């Protein structure tokens, strides 16, 4: 798996998932993300969880594709 694979997988996420995930990755707290995006805290948590889950699935596919 390469950085290109990771970048591609991130690019395949919907904006609704990618934006809170990337803000979290950049060090913002969930509460800060909630305020910045003007969405409920629970929604932030669900979107980040779903983004992680989707990324893992996509990266697993790349891992098997490389073999």
What are these regions (language model features)?
Residues 6, 20-21:
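Short alpha-helical "packing" element that flanks the helix-turn-helix/winged-helix DNA-binding module
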Residues 37-61:
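DNA-recognition helix of helix-turn-helix
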Residues 65-67:
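Intrinsically disordered, low-complexity basic tails/linkers immediately adjacent to helix-turn-helix/homeobox/MYB/SANT
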Residues 11, 15-18, 26-43:
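Helix-turn-helix DNA-binding module
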Residues 9-12, 23, 58:
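Short amphipathic alpha-helical elements of helix-turn-helix/winged-helix folds
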Residues 1-11:
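Acidic, proline/glycine-rich intrinsically disordered inter-domain spacer in sigma factors
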């Amino acid at each position: 798996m390469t950085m290109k694979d990771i970048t591609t997988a991130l690019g395949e996420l919907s904006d609704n998932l990618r934006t809170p995930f990337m803000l979290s990755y950049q060090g913002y707290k969930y509460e800060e993300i909630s305020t910045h995006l003007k969405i409920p805290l629970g929604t932030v948590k669900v979107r980040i969880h779903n983004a992680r889950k989707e990324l893992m699935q996509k990266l697993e596919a790349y891992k098997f594709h490389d073999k």
